Amino acid sequence: MIQFGIAPIGWTNDDMPELGGDITFEQCVSEMALAGYAGCEVGNKFPVNNLPLLKYQLELRKLQICNQWFSFELTKKPFHQVKNDFEKHIQFLHFFDAKVSGGAECGNTIHGNPNISLGDRKPASAEEWSLLTTGLNELGRFSIEEYGIKLSYHHHIGTMVESDEEVERLMNETHPEYVSLNYDCGHFALANEDSVGAFEKYHNRINHIHLKDKIGRASCRERV
């Protein structure tokens, strides 16, 4: 059964907290529930350091956590450090009975640097690809075997896995039992890729979907 959730970025922005900074956590999740969503992702207003309180607030509104972003830094940090952080992330999701863990490699992302444009993104090296895919396979195996949570990789604009070619390489070099795809039609469109074609191409690896409103609008890159 397909269930629909929503990300709190529609209320508050994690990268630019001043956007929606006046909106409370309670307002955010109440409006999610009133809109009819079954679940949500996790934002910066969520009381993640008080799990009983967070669980109570979500259960009160019949919401469940469906995913939480994780910034992998397998190309930048020692694997044991990434795994330690990842396990804490997985334990949080497990507490809420979530089945999916999303995120992307951020060790070489252009995000956070306003002086670098999307067109200045540098392709990853062979060594970086090896670090990423080997690390994802191990983290995905650990996550599913120890906690029953599937690693769902989010192809993301401005990161080393952005284009269809890069997504295809990631899928080819990771184990299908350990690494799935968090499909995002908006990020494929912004990368000038065929969103529908990509969905058809990778449908057997997709276990989590991010939907974006882009139909009938001008080119994403032109708008940006």
Predicted regions: what they are:
Residues 45, 106, 214:
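Flexible loop residues that form catalytic
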Residues 39-53, 72-84, 157-163, 185-193:
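Acidic-and-aromatic substrate-binding clefts and catalytic sites of carbohydrate-active enzymes
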Residues 10-24, 43, 71-83, 121-130:
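Active-site mouth loops of central-metabolism enzymes
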Residues 2-11, 40-42, 65-70, 101-103, ...:
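Hydrophobic faces of well-ordered beta-strands that scaffold small-molecule active sites
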Residues 6-10, 31-35, 67-70, 117-120, ...:
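A short alpha-helix capping/helix-coil boundary motif
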Residues 79-181, 190:
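Active-site acidic/histidine proton-transfer and metal-coordination neighborhood
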Residues 1-36, 59, 87, 92, ...:
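Histidine-acidic metal/acid-base catalytic patches
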